[in-house]
Design a protein with these regions (language model features):
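Structural motif
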Residues: 77-78, 108, 122
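Mobile, glycine-rich extracellular loop/lid and propeptide segments
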Residues: 115
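Short solvent-exposed loop/turn micro-motifs enriched in small/polar/acidic residues
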Residues: 67, 109-111
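Acidic interhelical loop/turn segments
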Residues: 101
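Short, P/G- and charge-enriched loop/turn segments at secondary-structure junctions
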Residues: 7, 59-60, 104-105, 149-151
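Gram-negative outer-membrane beta-barrel transporters
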Residues: 2-97, 136
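Generic secretory/membrane-interface signal
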Residues: 3, 13, 109, 128-131
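C-terminal beta-signal and adjacent terminal beta-strands/loops
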Residues: 89-98, 119-168
């Protein structure tokens, strides 16, 4: 005898929301500040499914979908040098649905991360790059029902990359 299982699409679900984006280059500033700029975006999503939380009785959102997320970017860019810093955030989200006997649903906690990069063109044929990912060493957390019922926690390492691009 074999037990066979497979993913199955849900019957119904609702998603409502909006996204805002803004970008501005400060070209009106005196040199060298005229090469500065910012970018920002924000997304709000309200979702629901027919699935009901076994403990609270409330309708559950779509798994994997945060209610709030945003990115803030500051940059400087000219013909030979560029630098960029970006902070990205997403609010908690439902990871998986569980019954009352299992202690409830699992969620991934809110998380923010800072990344940065720089690039310099030394000659038309030689460019150096430096990139830092997760400079704030953000922590990934998963919990069961409530944030104080932690089931997983891992501090992501900061990653630094250096690159050389040459053309012949």
């Amino acid at each position: 005898m074999f037990d066979i299982s497979q993913p199955q699409n849900g019957e119904d679900g609702d998603i409502k929301g909006f996204e805002l984006a803004y970008q501005h280059a400060f070209r009106f500033l005196p040199a060298p500040f005229d090469n500065l700029g910012i970018q920002a975006n924000y997304t709000y999503v309200d979702s629901s499914t027919p699935l009901v939380d076994a403990i609270t009785g409330e309708r559950l959102p779509l798994p994997g979908l945060s209610r709030d997320s945003y990115t803030l970017i500051g940059y400087y860019e000219d013909d030979t040098f560029s630098v960029r810093a970006a902070y990205t955030y997403r609010s908690k989200y439902l990871n998986s649905v569980g019954g009352a006997a299992s202690g409830g649903n699992t969620y991934i906690a809110a998380r923010g991360q800072l990344d940065a990069s720089a690039q310099i063109t030394l000659t038309p044929n030689l460019r150096l790059t430096l990139e830092g990912i997760n400079l704030t060493k953000a922590i990934d957390r998963q919990y069961l029902g409530e944030p104080d019922r932690l089931t997983f926690s891992a501090q992501e390492d900061r990653r630094i990359f250096f690159g050389v691009a040459a053309s012949f």
